Amino acid sequence: MSTFEKEPSSPDPKFYVAGVDVGQKQDHSAVAVVDKIDRRFALIHLKQFQLGTEYGSVIGYLKLLNENLHDLRRIMIDQTGVGETFMSMAINSGLKNARGIELSQPKKQDVMTFLKHCMEDGLVHIPYDREFMNELNVERFELLETGRLKFSHPPGTHDDRLWAFALAIYYARLEPTEYHPVAAVNTRPSPGNLFPQLPRSIWKR
C-alpha cells in the first residue's frame, strides 16, 4: 500500500483525508489516506517511512500526494513534540491543506475511541495487510486514575501507521453524510487490547 497512481478525472467529487504521524530515529513517520463515502471510511493508501527519514522527504511525499490525488481535502498532522517543527516546515513548503493537531491525552482518547467505534460498527474497510493488522491487534490501553485512557504498544512494535490512520478518520468524520447501516463487528474487545482479534471481514483482498 505504499505506492499510488494519479487519480483519473471523475465528475463526482471525493472526500479524501490524509493523516500524518511524525517520527524520526525511534519511531517511523507514517501517512494514511482515507476515502469518506457516506458514513464509511476506506483506507486507500498507507505509507511507512524508514527510521531516520528526513522531514523534507516526508513533506515532498505529501506534496506528491497533493499533486496526484484529486480532492485531498485535508492533511492532518500530529504536531505533538517533534511534530511542531514538521508542521512549520509543511506550512512553509506551501501545503495549504495541512493542519496540525495536538494529541493531548484527552484528544488521543477521542481519536482512538472514535476509530474503535467505527470499526465495531463495520464502517471501516482496509485492504489486507498482515503487518498493519498486527499493528492494530497489539495496541494496548490502560485506564488511569484520572479516568483517561493511556495508549501504548509492546516493545519491539510500532503504532505509527495506526495513529496516522486514526487521525485521517477523525477529521473525515466532519463531512456531512447520509446514514446507511452496515453490520457491526467485534463489539466486545478483550480488556487491555484496543482492537483484539479483528475479523477478516474488514480486510479487502
Specify the residue positions occupied by each region the protein language model found.
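Short, surface-exposed amphipathic charged segments that create phosphate/polyanion-binding patches used
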Residues: V111-D121
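RNase H-like, metal-dependent nuclease domains and their acidic two-metal-ion catalytic environment used
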Residues: M1-Q105, Q109, T113, I126-R205
